Amino acid sequence: MGTGVAQPPHVVSNADLVKVMDTSDEWIQSRTGVARRRYVAPGVGSVQLAAEAVSAALNDAGVAPGEVDLLVNATMTPDMFAPGNAALVQAEVGLERICAFEIRQQCSGFLYGLELADAMLANGRATTAVVVGAEAHAGYMPFGPTSWAMLRGTHDGPADPDEYAAATDSRAWSVLFGDGAGACVLRRGEDDSGFIGGRLFSDGGSYDLIHVPGIGFSRQPYIDAAQLEAGLCIPQMKGMELFRQAVRAMPSAVTGVLDSVGLSVSDLDLVIAHQANARIVSAVGTALGLDESVVPSNIAEHGNTTAATLPILFHEQRLAGRVGSGALVAFTAFGAGAHWGASLYRVP
């Protein structure tokens, strides 16, 4: 396996957000654990981030673009409504005319992508796969032009009162998210390493835990000024219920997949959990009875990058020497849909 990441250079700290909404560093960190996040510049989207991460992963794996015959792209923030990002990333990276498809499982997108790629490798439909999760959340941040100018350092203030009020109304979710991408290269192995088990779940009855109700084709027109003014084109979140379901679902998925292959929590060397919120990650570790060193977190530095949290964190753990040969790694995520699950990976 090779891994790679891509991150925008523009870092926005909690102190920066204080300038454009009614919040504080203490308020944000105590509720989310986020200290800073990155935002893409205008004109940069998740396609560019994904392409950079894929190229880095291929280089890390020593694999040429022409050897790849499957690309799975996970994002909830595509560059355009249609086509999806997958074909655009394929072209940007210079891959052949291969099977490239996109999935919309939000925070669980990379996890679902791993399982899909592993299945296609196992049945011989692919020999070399790339899975990438990439997000550019800046596009739906509730900031107006004056606020963006202040965050980018091109305007000293004061804040626009209407923009300040609108951003404050959305602070429960907007302080969480950041932009970034992570990718991995997978090949079919001949031994008992690689992905050895997985369990995926969905529950549409919980769709409104976090969702964007506007911009849908049940509406005519599918987007209009009224939706924008009503805030229907930005996320709506039921934070407490989301927390409760996530801290139950992820540990249950991990123990379930361990049971299915005859292993236990004590066999785990590392848990790569979706970085939704520092308290959620901590609660997952507690529920599994694992030390925080086994369930690491990087949300303080990146925020919640949805489909990119798993590959970015795994890449960082590889660089830190935490992913040695033979190590047993559990990937787990819970996100909008609701979609969740867990996968077990034995490092070759």
Please report, for each region that a protein language model flagged, where it lies by residue:
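Short acidic, glycine/serine/threonine-rich loops at helix termini
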Residues: V11-V12, A82-G84, Y140-P145, W340-L344
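Acidic-glycine-rich active-site phosphate/pyrophosphate-binding loop
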Residues: M21-S30, F81-G94, P142-D162, F217, ...
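Short coil/turn connectors at secondary-structure junctions
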Residues: P65-D69, L95-C99, N123-A129, R171-A172, ...
